[in-house]
Amino acid sequence: DAGLLGDEIITNGRTGVSYGSSTGSLDAILDFYSMCIDKEVKLLNSGSYIKMMPQTTAVNISLYFQTHGRLIPTSTACTSGSMGIGYAYEAIKDGYQDVMIAGGAEEIHPTQVGVFDTLYATSSKNNTPELTPSPFDKNRDGLVIGEGAGTLILEEYEHAKARGAHIYCEMVGYGVSCDAYHMTAPAPEGIGGAKAMINALQDASLEAN
């Protein structure tokens, strides 16, 4: 869609990857757990350790497309993909890259479903699945866990214009913050979220009006 397949910029060091995944393969992690319990390594192979590392997602993309620029793996739970996009934006804004492959991917596993259910974070509308999730409804009751991936191609504006690329939108600011409040719950006053928005507006030189 970006028209960059076969372009030398992919392999000349001016293209990087910034991609998120909250964890590696949980099947591989469970194989190591079995090793500790059973005192055997029969489930392990030369790729087991690599599979369980979250950075493998970004690395595999770089290997597949033979990019030689920055490689930025992000592993920040539910924000892994969005932070990957933010870091890609910064890499281009600061002049380190002209193009970045950015986004996130996650596979689903029964252990993940179990954890969110234990936290009472999942929706209980099993009889009416079409009504959930509904994050902006006052009667919302939780998440619906799924798997998937999303990828954006970020490109320096003048570079994109010069090659006649179809530009969907322009990213002009990015902001991030940390609540430093709780492992799973946001700060009740919304300070962290507000700070992230303020940082993004300041980065974009925009007023909140």
Protein language model annotation of sequence segments:
Residues D1-L5, P54-F65, R70-A105, V144-A165:
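Active-site-proximal alpha-helical scaffold in enzymes
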Residues D1-T76, A105-V113, A208-N209:
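Conserved beta-ketoacyl condensing-enzyme motif
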Residues A2-G6, I37, F65, I92, ...:
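Structural signal for hydrophobic packing residues in well-ordered secondary-structure cores
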Residues R14-S18, D98-A102, P133, Y168, ...:
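Short glycine-aspartate micro-motif
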Residues D27-V41, A91-D94, V115-N126, P188-I191:
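A glycine- and small-aliphatic-rich helix-loop capping segment at beta-alpha/alpha-beta transitions
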Residues G103-N139:
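Phosphate/pyrophosphate-binding betaalpha-module
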Residues P129-A208:
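Condensing-enzyme catalytic core mediating Claisen C-C bond formation in acyl metabolism
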